[in-house]
Amino acid sequence: EQAKNWFNLKHIGKSPSRFDFKKLSNISKLHIANTDNAALLHELIEYLNVVDQPSLSQNHLNGLLRSLDFTKSSVKNFPELIEKNSFILKDRPINIDPDVTEKIEEFPLKTLKILTPQLQNVKWDRSKLEELLNSVCEQVELKFRTVAPILRAALAGSSKTPSVFDMMTVLGREETIERLIEFEVKYNNEI
């Protein structure tokens, strides 16, 4: 209703009533950030239908619902929301963006060999995952900021993702481990 009042046609052509894309973008951002996750997911499904995108599987929908808590606040529109959540919409094997592959060649993959088995037993919540990853970084004498881009590549195929910890919690233990193993096997064979 508020958008209808702001963008009515009564005074079109007069300065205050001009169609302002910046204002529209702001309204869209506020709407996305303040909409209940289930309602937002329903709107996103409708958007995908309108733009002739394939429908999402139940696994993708469940993952999106879990990830909206930490992704919806930083986007202005549905295309950005989809991009921000692309990690959950990808199926294995994960294709790695070309801009990330050169970082992989410089990365000691032994870090993943140490991390992956330990993920089997850790309590699967953000704080415990953060503790474990920091501990593994200490073991291999690397800073987390050095390891994070490779984890992003393994989990999402990209460097533009939400937090590694948030992605891991949304993907779940099994999917996270499978993605890390596939990544390690692929790049151990290529390097």
Identify what each model region corresponds to.
Residues 123, 127-187:
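Charged substrate- and nucleic-acid-binding regions of tRNA-handling and nucleotidyl-transfer enzymes
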Residues 33-37, 79-80, 157-163:
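Short helix-capping/linker segments at secondary-structure and domain boundaries
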Residues 26-30, 69-76, 149-153:
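Short, hydrophobic/amphipathic alpha-helical patches that form generic packing surfaces
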Residues 21-25, 65, 69, 145-149, ...:
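Non-catalytic, well-ordered alpha-helical scaffold segments
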Residues 37-142:
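Small-residue-rich helix-loop
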Residues 1-52:
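A conserved active-site cap/scaffold subdomain adjacent to cofactor or substrate pockets
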Residues 3-12, 51, 95-98, 138-141, ...:
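Short, mixed-charge aromatic SLiMs
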